[in-house]
Amino acid sequence: MCSSDLSLPLFNNEERAIVGTAYKKEDKQKAIKLGLDFFGVKMRKMVEEVEKHTKNKSQKIVVHCWRGGMRSAGVAWLLDLYGYEVCTITGGYKAFRRWTLEQFEKEYSFRILGGYTGSSKTELLQSLLESNESIIDLEGMAHHKGSAFGSLGQPPQPTQEMFENKLAQKLYENSNAKRIWVEDESQRIGSVNIPKALWSSLRKAPLYFIEIPFEERLAFILKNYGVFDKEKLVNSIMRIQKRFGPMETKTAINFILEGDIKSAFSLLLHYYDKHYIKAMHTRENIKELLHTISSDSVSASANKELLLSFIKE
């Protein structure tokens, strides 16, 4: 999929009805001529709109309509004529969505990277990538870190459909990998959900739990989230108040308002630790799946070496 998406309406509803009626009641050629009448006056605006969203003409553009017919072919021709490298999706977006959903049903060699909140798992994933390991960064694609503070500092979340599209492409790119590292997540990441079939596969994969001391993780959380203003931190805590509990919520918010961010985060970390252990043990065959690796720091490079050494044993 493209790094960004742009909707270019070829026809408005009235124009679409006119062209469609001509195609059904007269013939294809008549419909094409009518379509060209509507399309012709929009060509320049379409090109200019694409220019606003692309860095240069060397950027590849994927053009699609719902079924991959003349509409996408016409726009692809126009952009190709202007100098862009263009391709279309055979069968249109409808076929692409069917392909997307099929990717979640396939088998993959997943390895789950686990650890309590604040264990620097995302940084460890990126460090594994630097060592030519295959990874899928679910939080990166979801634009959300998963916790109460997960949306802080992140761009807006994608729609569920766009999340699935990008996830399917990433799965396809790594389908032949010896192993694919994925961070242990809840099925819901902010406002998007990991597709059910894929979620089921992830829950059956080996889980490598990086066990890091509480104080190390607390320091990591403070460094990454303590920089945000009090209002944002309070709003984030309010989102989990039903699960966190009324007394704990009130205490944590008071700590933040008093400037004692460390104590507030300590309460939250204890909450997430309990929640994580409970969720982890809902897996079937957890005793067979779980591999615990002890570490004394959140250093991604050091923990990568520990992890890779462990799986070679």
PLM segments and residue spans:
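Short, small-residue-biased leader/transition segments that mark boundaries at the very start
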Residues: 2-3
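Hydrophobic/aromatic beta-strand patches that form the interior of the parallel beta-sheet core
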Residues: 6-8, 87, 111, 134-136, ...
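Helix-loop module immediately N-terminal to the HCX5R catalytic loop
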Residues: 16-18, 25-59, 97-102
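Catalytic cysteine-centered active loop of the rhodanese-like fold, especially the PTP/DSP P-loop
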Residues: 39-89
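Glycine-rich phosphate-binding P-loop
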Residues: 70-71, 111-130
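A short glycine-rich beta-strand->turn/loop micro-motif centered on a GG-aromatic cluster
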Residues: 82-97, 137-142
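Conserved nucleotide-sensing/catalytic segment adjacent to the nucleotide-binding pocket
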Residues: 130-200
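Conserved NTP phosphate-binding and transfer environment spanning the P-loop NTPase/kinase superfamily
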Residues: 200-207, 211-313
